[in-house]
């Protein structure tokens, strides 16, 4: 309960028609009394005032109520301060359009929604926003004025109209030693505030939250909106405690499923709802995840248009930002950026890996080191820029049940370490920020020569710039890996090896596979980024069981450099061959001379 206290010099007749009791006392030999607000006076109803002597000081203590009599609580009808801080921040991207969707589903069969996203993708901000909009404990009209939702016809209809319960399960978990204690704390805290708001309602069981809400609804027809943040923290903290997980799911089912008093239920977390075979605890929820966010895709992260506006304001290169933080793609929205990383980049004015501020690479290492056939090879293929097919249907939405490589890859989608294309059911590493996380994880893992090659890739790139052909060949040899599904027997497989050997080149170049130019397609072309125009462009041609000199000759004959005319005079031709018999890589490097025709 929040209290307002103030001293007031009074005399005469003092009305207290909404007071529970009067407490008299003395302070420094001065009499005072305390007025406490409430609905049921404990005195004679005919008494409506108290006469006190002149110059008596009165300590008035009142609960923090809105003008309509609604209490503002911590869990029941919170205020809008958290969302106000977000709106007042240096960078705020308006995502209030989400409210238009939730307004469209209130009081329908689709009124239960579970939204899952990776860490730092704005889940809590969305929950705070919905709370600020629906809660009866605050007046948010001014806060939302000027934002997108204020233009919608549903804005006034639902603004601050409902008893809203907001629960951050991580907060309760941090103060609980087990799930049972957590649920007792949740019920106790919320019921206490419900009793203050509805003191006249007779409750059947004051320790049962669902029963309490049902009793209040039966007497007052009050509709509740329930917003749960970090709903899945139990599954991340108690990974192996299946019994505790089921108890938690059953609690949510009893609280939310088929209840007349639920007007809207909105849950958000990292993982989708846990599957327990035929146990359909929360099957009333519509789920929107990183696999298929549906109509909520534009609220997963920042869109292209939103990032372009930020780049213009903060004078950042959109292409660089795109390379580092873009890559999440959905049917409804083709380009989605990692919001926390974009905000950090804009505020600090420099590109970098901001992902590791939310989670260390060891979290990724645990999963890519798992012993599933094909997993390591697929990770390497994706680091090299390839996509990999995946079946997401067998994943049980927890962090311990892995039966196949597909289950591991699916978890990495939900954690944000992989992007997913719904159309062709493939996964990929979305951007350079995430790619660097994989390289960091591999560097401390037992991945043999691959780990060494990635660490030495900067030296291999430097060797190309300096024309040291034998050192380049040695760097490629280190990156040479055997796979089951990508046999090292053609130029395509060789290209994966080159991509790993030259991983460090991504810091300086935009990499193009099969780039059209002249009379055909160059195998790999490295185009310098705007910040590194002093670096030479690289045209790499690969040969299998032939010779490196022939690769250089093909670049010239087919005029692959024609599309790179602006780099004339600062262009290196790189030919690489793998001899099947000797199992030796050879390299030939030649500078494209200015006088040669492009």
Model-identified regions with their sequence ranges:
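Nucleic-acid nuclease catalytic cores
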Residues: 548-552, 559-589
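Phosphate-binding site recognition
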Residues: 50-486
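Conserved catalytic cores of phosphodiester-cleaving nucleases, focusing on short active-site segments
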Residues: 498, 522-526, 535-546, 558
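Aromatic (phenylalanine/tyrosine) cluster motif
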Residues: 6-7, 16, 24-27, 32-33, ...
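Acidic-basic catalytic patches of nuclease active cores, encompassing PD-(D/E)XK
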Residues: 478-512
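Active-site metal-binding core of divalent-cation-utilizing nuclease and nuclease-like domains
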Residues: 215-220, 506-533
């Amino acid at each position: 309960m929040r209290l307002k206290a103030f001293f007031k010099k009074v005399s005469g007749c003092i009305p207290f028609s909404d007071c529970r009791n009067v407490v008299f006392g003395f302070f420094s030999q001065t009499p005072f009394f305390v007025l406490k607000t409430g609905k049921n006076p404990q005195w004679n109803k005919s008494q409506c005032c108290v006469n006190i002597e002149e110059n008596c000081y009165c300590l008035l203590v009142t609960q923090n109520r809105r003008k309509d009599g609604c209490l503002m609580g911590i869990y029941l009808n919170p205020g809008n301060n958290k969302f106000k801080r977000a709106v007042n921040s240096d960078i705020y991207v308006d995502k209030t359009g989400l409210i238009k969707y939730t307004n469209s589903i209130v009081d329908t069969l689709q009124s239960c929604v579970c939204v899952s996203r990776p860490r730092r993708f704005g889940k809590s901000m969305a929950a705070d926003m919905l709370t600020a909009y629906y809660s009866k404990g605050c007046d948010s009209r001014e806060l939302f004025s000027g934002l997108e939702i204020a233009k919608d016809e549903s804005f006034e209809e639902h603004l601050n109209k409902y008893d809203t319960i907001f629960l951050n399960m991580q907060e309760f978990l941090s103060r609980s030693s087990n799930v049972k204690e957590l649920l007792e704390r949740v019920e106790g805290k919320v019921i206490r505030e419900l009793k203050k708001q509805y003191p006249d309602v007779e409750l059947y069981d004051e320790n049962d939250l669902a029963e309490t809400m049902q009793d209040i609804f039966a007497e007052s027809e009050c509709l509740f909106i329930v917003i749960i943040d970090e709903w899945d923290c139990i599954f991340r903290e108690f990974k192996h405690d299946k019994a505790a997980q089921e108890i938690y799911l059953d609690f949510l089912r009893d609280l939310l499923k088929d209840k007349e008093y639920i007007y809207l239920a909105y849950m958000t977390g990292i993982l989708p709802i846990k599957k327990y075979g035929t146990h359909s605890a929360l099957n009333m929820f519509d789920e929107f995840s990183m696999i298929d966010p549906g109509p909520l895709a534009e609220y997963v992260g920042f869109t292209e248009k939103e990032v372009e506006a930020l780049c213009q304001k903060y004078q950042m290169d959109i292409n660089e930002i795109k390379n580092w933080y873009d890559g999440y793609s959905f049917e409804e929205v083709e380009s989605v950026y990692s919001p926390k990383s974009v905000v950090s980049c804009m505020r600090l004015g420099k590109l970098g890996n901001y992902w590791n501020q939310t989670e260390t690479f060891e979290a990724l290492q645990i999963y890519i080191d798992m012993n599933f056939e094909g997993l390591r090879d697929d990770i390497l293929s994706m680091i090299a820029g390839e996509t990999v097919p995946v079946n997401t249907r067998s994943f049980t939405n927890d962090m311990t049940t892995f039966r196949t490589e597909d289950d591991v890859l699916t978890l990495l989608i939900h954690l944000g370490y992989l992007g997913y294309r719904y159309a062709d059911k493939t996964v990929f590493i979305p951007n350079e920020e995430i790619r660097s996380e994989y390289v960091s994880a591999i560097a401390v893992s037992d991945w043999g020569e691959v780990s060494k090659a990635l660490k030495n890739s900067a030296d291999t790139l430097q060797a190309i710039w300096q024309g040291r052909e034998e050192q380049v060949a040695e760097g490629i040899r280190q990156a040479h890996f055997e796979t089951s599904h990508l046999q090292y027997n053609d130029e395509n497989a060789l290209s994966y090896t080159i991509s790993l050997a030259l991983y460090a080149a991504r810091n300086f170049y935009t990499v193009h596979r099969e780039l059209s130019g002249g009379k055909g397609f160059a195998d790999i072309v490295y185009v310098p980024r705007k910040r590194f125009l002093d670096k030479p462009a690289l045209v790499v041609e690969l040969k299998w069981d032939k010779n490196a000199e022939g690769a250089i000759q093909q670049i010239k004959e087919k005029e692959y450099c024609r599309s790179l005319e602006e780099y004339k005079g600062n262009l290196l031709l790189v030919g690489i061959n793998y001899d099947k018999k000797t199992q030796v890589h050879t390299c030939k490097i030649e500078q494209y001379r200015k006088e040669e025709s492009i």
